[in-house]
A protein has these predicted regions:
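Nucleic-acid nuclease catalytic cores
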Residues: 74-166
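Metal-dependent nuclease catalytic cores that hydrolyze phosphodiester bonds in DNA/RNA
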Residues: 1-84
Length: 166
């Protein structure tokens, strides 16, 4: 069963450089995700990680919004709709059920983020608010509200399925 990020990969393609995401940034993002999850579980903010600014930004977001997470790095799939995904966070922000996706890019790709969060909302199958959380290297963050766009996600599904036919 394909993942949401596999289905939406077309939105992340860099037409200028002819590739997807840079491996360095992908690895950095993975590390930040792991350390933010550790912080959620332990309440301890690690230091000396090489990504301390991103972690400070996440801690500041948590201080400012006081989210109540029901799920952290939540793996979900649905055979009936034919895809799966790992949702960074699901829980309550400002009293509303939300899906939050963490981004570490200096300029998040909003089309890709919209497609990704829409896929996650479809999987969760509950009324939710969608957010991207941009964590910045210097310790700032930006909470980005996203409107679900099912036409965009379905277009990604069509491209994905066409790519499977050879």
């Amino acid at each position: 069963m394909p993942s949401v990020t596999t289905i939406t990969r077309f939105c992340s393609y860099d037409s200028v450089n002819g590739n997807g995401s840079n491996p360095f940034y992908r690895e950095r993002g993975t590390l930040v995700h792991e350390l933010c999850a550790d912080y959620d579980f332990t309440g301890e903010l690690p230091t000396g990680t090489g990504v301390d600014g991103f972690l400070k930004a996440y801690a500041d977001f948590k201080r400012d919004y006081r989210p109540k997470w029901d799920y952290i790095e939540y793996m979900i799939g649905n055979a009936d709709i034919g895809f799966a995904g790992t949702l960074d966070r699901v829980g309550y922000i400002d009293g509303q059920l939300a899906i939050l996706d963490i981004k570490t890019a200096s300029k998040p790709n909003l089309v890709a983020l919209t497609a990704q969060l829409t896929g996650y909302a479809w999987l969760l199958d509950k009324p939710v608010i969608l957010y991207g959380l941009q964590l910045q290297k210097k310790g700032d963050y930006k909470l980005i509200p996203i409107q679900a766009d099912y036409e965009l996600f379905k277009a990604c599904q069509v491209l994905h399925k066409k790519g499977l036919k050879k």
